[in-house]
């Protein structure tokens, strides 16, 4: 007497955290808003059935997106991955209809290709990458035409399965047909299915007398090619307790038949509902912070700036000369841009007035060196940043030598630091402090960004590339001057010694300085970019001058000045050839620089010209009577 056939679920999924980590990178860097189907390649663990499991596992891990996984030992299973851009879209999906559509695709693959291609799986997923929470649902479509009916005519144990060892050891498929003439199990296309009526299935179930639901798929395809046969034999191979079924197969299994499909996986409570994977709880917090920083930046590439090069920013090594108000705000902005290497140089200590204006310091830092405190604060904000602080004094032109050995050492260390970095920010309080770094930036061909503050105004500029011809080169901070910088710090009142500015000026200038640097990095010509051109982020001006009273900013261009005290060829060459010997003299007497650069001659010519323009009494107009 024939009996109805009961089936076991085909698989239990096991999704490793590495699967979602790979998908996260794929989503951010490649797919972005693209939600097209992705191929998956999984391995079926039948060995686990011998260890007490009732259903075999399908493993998804970091290799599942790699086609090469299919060539690895073990049974391979093809699948598809569908990612949704919003949680609402994931929820709105008609799950029953979607399962039926996927079942139809497997049915057609089995009918038109090989029998084993009627088995497969898919995963639908929404990734909340801000919280590292993944909503997903695994399904293995199992189907049969609505009119198809399967009955068990005979069930018996299989004791001699050694003859199937070649099929088990050498094949990566779940199902084939038995060549009844040779006893060999072969992969089954339409030709073999029309000829043979014994299916051989690697059973993924370990439940007694209860085969995998995939048997329905295989028998339905067999029936399609054998509409006039009503008996089919199925050999179910297991690690233990293999058995055979003789089935009575009735009903229609044509291509136009409506399929009954099932296959959504139940959760641990036995409910038909998606699962949630919370990776945020298991990922190293520092790695999670790194990925979150990258997330915000990579989202720019999705719609807003697809061509932005984030790696060139991330890999840029930045030197901040000055760890005061400007230095702190520039450092925070660079960190937000993903810069990983930031070095501070400052010779001061944190004063009690600093923490309210300089965001890298707090009350407990007062009295500590600024450079090292700023670096420590950056690491506290983001532990993976390579932040270092150097407490050294930048030798200043026009200031007498007080300790030549120490100042020479500071010069050599400063030159090496500039050599080791890609961008140099000049963020100090005085003009003369910026003179030597400007020359060294030219010597080492570095991108130099300069920011300076007034009470209610600011200047942000990029220095021209010294390797360009002087006639077309952009000017530096000192190209406006007709005198060399000198001691501006001595004999100053309290309001002149402190940096007195409107509090918002530093934030604006720091933001412009950072954005200008990043925009230049994005330009194909880098620091050679003409000030009238644009990068993917917009314009790359030479300099910006801002005025808070009018809430205005203007873009200006200043060409390189051939008599400049910092970027003229004679000054740069003098430092290149003579190094500290030249600088020692210039530090003591700034007029040496004026004479060498030609500024002294310009001053003399100007005075002579003005003298000839003096109007004598005889040149006055007659009074009108």
Swiss-Prot record:
Compartment(s) where it occurs, according to its Swiss-Prot or TrEMBL record: Cytoplasm; Preautophagosomal structure
User: Which GO MF terms does the UniProt record name?
Assistant: Atg12 activating enzyme activity; Atg8 activating enzyme activity; identical protein binding
Renumbered to this chain, motif GXGXXG motif spans 322-327
Keywords (alphabetical) are: Autophagy, Cytoplasm, Protein transport, Transport, Ubl conjugation pathway
Q: Name one GO cellular component term.
A: phagophore assembly site
Could you describe the subunit structure of this protein?
Homodimer.
Task: Quote the entry's note on domains.
Answer: The GxGxxG motif is important for the function, possibly through binding with ATP.
Protein name listed in UniProt: Ubiquitin-like modifier-activating enzyme ATG7
Q: Which species is this UniProt entry from?
A: Eremothecium gossypii (strain ATCC 10895 / CBS 109.51 / FGSC 9923 / NRRL Y-1056)
């Amino acid at each position: 007497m024939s009996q109805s056939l009961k089936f076991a679920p085909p698989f239990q999924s096991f999704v490793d955290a590495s699967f979602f980590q790979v998908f996260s990178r794929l989503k951010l860097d490649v797919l972005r808003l693209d939600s097209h189907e992705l191929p998956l390649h999984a391995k079926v663990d039948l060995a686990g059935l011998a260890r007490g499991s009732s259903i075999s596992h399908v493993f998804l891990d970091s290799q599942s997106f790699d086609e090469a996984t299919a060539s690895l030992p073990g049974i391979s299973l093809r699948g598809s991955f569908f990612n949704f851009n919003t949680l609402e879209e994931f929820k709105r999906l008609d799950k029953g209809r979607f399962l039926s559509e996927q079942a139809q695709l497997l049915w057609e693959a089995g009918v038109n290709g090989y029998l084993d291609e009627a088995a497969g799986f898919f995963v639908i997923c929404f990734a909340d990458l801000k919280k590292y929470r993944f909503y997903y649902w695994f399904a293995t479509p199992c189907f049969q035409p609505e009119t198809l009916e399967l009955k068990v005519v005979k069930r018996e144990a299989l004791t001699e399965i050694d003859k199937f060892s070649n099929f088990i050891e050498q094949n990566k498929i779940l199902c084939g047909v038995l060549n009844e003439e040779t006893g060999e199990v072969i992969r089954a296309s339409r030709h073999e299915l029309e000829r043979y009526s014994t299916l051989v299935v690697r059973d993924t179930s370990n439940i007694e007398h209860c085969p995998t639901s995939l048997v329905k798929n295989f028998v339905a395809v067999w029936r399609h090619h054998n509409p006039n046969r009503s008996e089919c034999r199925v050999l179910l191979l297991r690690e233990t307790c293999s058995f055979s079924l003789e089935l009575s197969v009735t009903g229609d299994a044509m291509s136009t038949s409506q399929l009954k499909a099932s296959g959504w996986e139940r959760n641990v409570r036995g409910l038909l509902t998606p699962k949630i994977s919370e990776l945020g709880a298991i990922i190293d917090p520092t790695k999670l912070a790194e990925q979150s920083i990258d997330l915000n930046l990579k989202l720019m590439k999705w719609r807003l700036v697809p061509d932005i090069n984030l790696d060139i920013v991330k890999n840029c090594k930045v030197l901040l000369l000055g760890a005061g108000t400007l230095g702190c705000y520039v450092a925070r902005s660079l960190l937000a841009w993903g810069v990983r290497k930031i070095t501070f140089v400052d010779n001061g200590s944190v004063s009690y007035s600093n923490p309210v204006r300089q965001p890298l310091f707090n009350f407990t830092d007062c009295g500590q060196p600024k450079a090292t405190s700023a670096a420590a604060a950056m690491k506290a904000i983001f532990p993976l940043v390579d932040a270092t602080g150097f407490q050294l004094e930048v030798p200043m032109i026009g200031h007498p030598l007080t300790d030549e050995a120490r100042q020479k050492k500071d010069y050599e260390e400063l030159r090496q630091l500039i050599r080791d970095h890609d961008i140099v920010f000049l963020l100090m309080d005085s003009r003369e402090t910026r003179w030597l770094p400007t020359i060294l930036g030219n010597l080492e061909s570095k991108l130099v960004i300069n920011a300076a503050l007034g009470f209610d105004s600011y200047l942000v500029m990029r220095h021209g590339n010294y390797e360009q011809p002087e006639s077309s080169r952009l000017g530096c901070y000192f190209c406006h001057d007709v005198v060399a910088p000198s001691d501006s710090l001595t004999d100053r009142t309290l309001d002149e010694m402190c940096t007195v500015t409107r509090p918002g000026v530093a934030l604006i200038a720091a933001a412009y300085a950072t954005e200008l640097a990043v925009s230049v990095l994005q330009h194909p010509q880098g620091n050679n970019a003409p000030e009238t051109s644009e990068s993917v982020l917009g314009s790359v001006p030479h300099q910006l001058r801002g005025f808070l009273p009018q809430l205005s900013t203007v873009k200006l261009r200043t060409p390189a000045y051939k008599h400049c005290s910092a970027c003229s060829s004679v000054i740069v060459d003098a430092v290149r050839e003579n190094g500290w010997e030249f600088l020692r003299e210039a530090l003591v007497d700034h007029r040496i620089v004026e004479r060498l650069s030609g500024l002294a001659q310009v001053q003399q010519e100007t005075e002579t010209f003005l003298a000839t323009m003096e109007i004598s009494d005889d040149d006055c107009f007659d009074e009108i009577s």
